[in-house]
């Protein structure tokens, strides 16, 4: 176990359920000064609205932090429809650094674990290891999934229950790709005290224990796009981050966007085929979700 600067506490802020007519999400249990973020489990849909023959593609365009414990989803549509929509996913917040009264063990730029009053939303690392993803991998626990892999042709996505691997491709076929992936899953389970270092709050609840690996966060984020970005020896949060729609074999094939990693570099990539329709009414193009994805050191 390594004790280092940047030990933060991720806190579960609730689940966004897919819905129409609304775009604002509440960060449940919001703490002032925390860093909220959203991990979408799906970021694209297509809707055919009668009498239109050409489908409307809608994509999660970004997230606005309103600064008051709420987040607003921004939605883009291929024909300017402008319908409000909530895309599904999970809301999280990274509790701020602090040190109450300068007492106890000071770990630089770290959450004051003793000041956490309620552990019901605290997430800790419940699984870490290397797994093989060959098309679909069922997660051993549901939570916030960070990953690292080395394959410049493998796009990874996650819907909260499964990791999906696809060849980064724009043709007709939906091609699975086998890739070994290092993952770390943070789920809402309070730490269990044991041998080693434990932090106990005033209510007698364990808020940190070296029986589980800590969440190390150094304020690093990645915004998905087509260009490779060096993120160092790090892991990145998996989700769904946009769409690509292209014509092949007489069909318009709409894919969701995921992430591709090669060495220390990461970029966006084309993932699963989510829908297809005749190219007589094609809608082509691509768009990434303009959002910041958290990055953590690859120490798990």
Where are these regions (language model features)?
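Extracellular receptor-binding modules and their adjoining Ser/Thr/Gly/Asp/Asn-rich linkers
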Residues: 1-37, 41-44, 66-136, 167-251, ...
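A cross-kingdom feature marking solvent-exposed beta-strand/loop segments within repeated
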Residues: 52-62, 132, 151-177
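N-terminal accessory interaction module
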Residues: 62-69, 251-262, 266
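Generic marker of "main functional regions" within proteins
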Residues: 147-149, 155, 191, 195
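Carbohydrate-recognition beta-sandwich/jelly-roll modules
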Residues: 153, 257-258, 287
């Amino acid at each position: 176990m390594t004790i280092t600067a940047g030990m933060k506490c991720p806190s579960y802020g609730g689940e966004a359920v897919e819905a129409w007519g609304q775009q604002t999400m509440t960060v449940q249990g919001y703490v002032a000064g925390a860093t909220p973020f959203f991990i979408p489990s799906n970021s694209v849909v297509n809707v055919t609205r009668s009498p239109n023959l050409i489908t409307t593609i809608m994509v999660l365009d970004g997230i606005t932090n309103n600064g008051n414990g709420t987040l607003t989803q921004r939605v883009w549509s291929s024909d300017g429809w402008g319908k409000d929509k909530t895309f599904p996913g999970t809301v999280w917040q990274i509790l701020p650094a602090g040190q109450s009264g300068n007492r106890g063990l000071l770990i630089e730029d770290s959450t004051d674990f003793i000041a956490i009053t309620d552990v019901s939303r605290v997430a800790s690392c419940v699984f870490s290891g290397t797994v093989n993803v060959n098309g679909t991998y069922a997660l051993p626990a549901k939570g916030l999934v960070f990953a690292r892999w080395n394959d410049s042709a493998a796009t990874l996505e996650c819907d909260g229950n499964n990791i999906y691997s696809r060849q980064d491709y724009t043709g007709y076929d939906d091609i699975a790709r086998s890739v070994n992936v290092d993952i770390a899953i943070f789920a809402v389970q309070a730490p269990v005290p044991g041998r080693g270092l434990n932090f106990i709050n005033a209510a007698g609840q364990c808020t940190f224990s070296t029986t589980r690996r800590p969440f190390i966060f150094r304020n690093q984020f990645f915004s998905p796009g087509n260009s490779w970005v060096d993120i160092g020896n790090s892991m990145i949060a998996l989700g769904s981050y946009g769409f690509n729609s292209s014509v092949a074999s007489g069909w318009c094939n709409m894919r969701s966007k995921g992430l591709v990693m090669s060495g220390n570099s990461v970029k966006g990539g084309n993932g699963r085929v989510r829908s297809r329709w005749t190219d007589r009414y094609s809608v082509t193009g691509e768009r990434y979700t303009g959002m910041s994805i958290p990055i953590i050191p690859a120490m798990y």
